[in-house]
Amino acid sequence: MGHSPPVLPLCASVSLLGGLTFGYELAVISGALLPLQLDFGLSCLEQEFLVGSLLLGALLASLVGGFLIDCYGRKQAILGSNLVLLAGSLTLGLAGSLAWLVLGRAVVGFAISLSSMACCIYVSELVGPRQRGVLVSLYEAGITVGILLSYALNYALAGTPWGWRHMFGWATAPAVLQSLSLLFLPAGTDETATHKDLIPLQGGEAPKLGPGRPRYSFLDLFRARDNMRGRTTVGLGLVLFQQLTGQPNVLCYASTIFSSVGFHGGSSAVLASVGLGAVKVAATLTAMGLVDRAGRRALLLAGCALMALSVSGIGLVSFAVPMDSGPSCLAVPNATGQTGLPGDSGLLQDSSLPPIPRTNEDQREPILSTAKKTKPHPRSGDPSAPPRLALSSALPGPPLPARGHALLRWTALLCLMVFVSAFSFGFGPVTWLVLSEIYPVEIRGRAFAFCNSFNWAANLFISLSFLDLIGTIGLSWTFLLYGLTAVLGLGFIYLFVPETKGQSLAEIDQQFQKRRFTLSFGHRQNSTGIPYSRIEISAAS
């Protein structure tokens, strides 16, 4: 179409490098925390505060980032976030005290949160319907690659003097490369000019921009106008079920489950990190290949169903199988949890939690017990704090034979792998893809950021409520409750989330405008021959 720069490869590099930066920054603390503890004499509380400072910065970005994205443009937001990330990385690399480390981590958290929102929106608007699913999902693949890359660099730099400074500094490399890629892509300050440049890529007609285009305020997200309330319901439902299915806490026990099947000591942590990382990469690549063929709705339904089965399986197994102890709070954290950020990776959600009160069921439920630790530690809801938990359980009646225990432990490991895979081709990439599609361009940044803030809040709520929930109903019933929540999420997706594959952003917007509230049953064809799944409950006024 006369474009000299290779637009699709550049879009792919923007998405991949953005995700790689995101994943690297999330995971790098796992290797840097132990040398930081030794160099600065950090207590458990100080370690948690350092790790949690990233969350504070990301939360701030989710609150104000949408306005920045809509006011200054997607491309400018990405470039600005990369500059902020460079400043944060420089602060971390030169830090001489805990205060500077916390400041640097908070700045980095702000940068990666803003970049994640802007990248998903920018790429979704830049490419056509046939490429949108693959290229936006590439961000999730970049996250998993970035996490694995951070593990490799952490290992290589672990024994070097001031190695943690280099660990933080290497995050600037993908950010610089992403900025260079953006220089050859259309700008976003002039909305009309930008969209005219994008028409050959979208393969459709130019949208009517200018005075005739509707203007939206933030409060319109909660009004019936153009079915904005229905769109917000879909967006919030997806991000909330993404977290309320319990994946921030289930993956805390990855290293424990690996240890229970015979991988003890350091090998347990390595396998929990690298092994699950490899599983996530494979599942994300599968999602990339299917998202524009099978569709967003199909992947969400399949992923949520498998998550419900697998987390329920872990809960049932934990009734009978005692788990081995985990690391102490001063050990290098095993980064195998989930942050709940866009493109959510599922590898960074270890929790640092205090002792859990025993249940009133005479130990009939598996419960958590804290490993030995050097200092008392207050409760923390930080989703990436260093772990120091162990699983223990006891069942009344005769113990299972050793062979039975082994079978159940391997079953728990299989369920964990299925859970990670299901999240990685379902909620992980598809949630953010759908959010980047369903809102009008004029308010897309603010709407995306609004939903993202609820994702962070739900992640924090799940982490904070975990102890009380286990103390009340026990570990096994907690996992079974997560399974029930996944079943409810399955129903929500089936009823409310339409299929958007193969449709331009303008067509998706028009479909939402025609209905105040929709339920999705089966598949049918619209007048343009593009399949989507919904039935009309009430016509728009």
UniProtKB/Swiss-Prot annotation:
It catalyses: D-glucose(out) = D-glucose(in). It is found in: Endomembrane system; Cytoplasm, Perinuclear region. D-glucose binds at Q242, Q243, W432. GO terms for cellular component: cytosol; endomembrane system; membrane; perinuclear region of cytoplasm; plasma membrane. It is a multi-pass membrane protein. Signal peptide: none annotated. Residues 1-15, 70-77, 128-134, 188-233, 291-298, 436-445, 498-541 are cytoplasmic. GO terms for molecular function: carbohydrate:proton symporter activity; D-glucose transmembrane transporter activity; dehydroascorbic acid transmembrane transporter activity. It comes from the Eukaryota. Residues 340-388 are annotated as: Disordered. The chain crosses the membrane at residues 16-36, 49-69, 78-98, 107-127, 135-155, 167-187, 234-254, 270-290, 299-319, 415-435, 446-466, 477-497. Changing A206T: Associated with lower insulin level. Belongs to the major facilitator superfamily. Sugar transporter (TC 2.A.1.1) family. Glucose transporter subfamily. It is linked to Arterial tortuosity syndrome: An autosomal recessive disorder characterized by tortuosity and elongation of major arteries, often resulting in death at young age. Other typical features include aneurysms of large arteries and stenosis of the pulmonary artery, in association with facial features and several connective tissue manifestations such as soft skin and joint laxity. Histopathological findings include fragmentation of elastic fibers in the tunica media of large arteries. This is Solute carrier family 2, facilitated glucose transporter member 10. It comes from Homo sapiens (Human). The gene is SLC2A10.
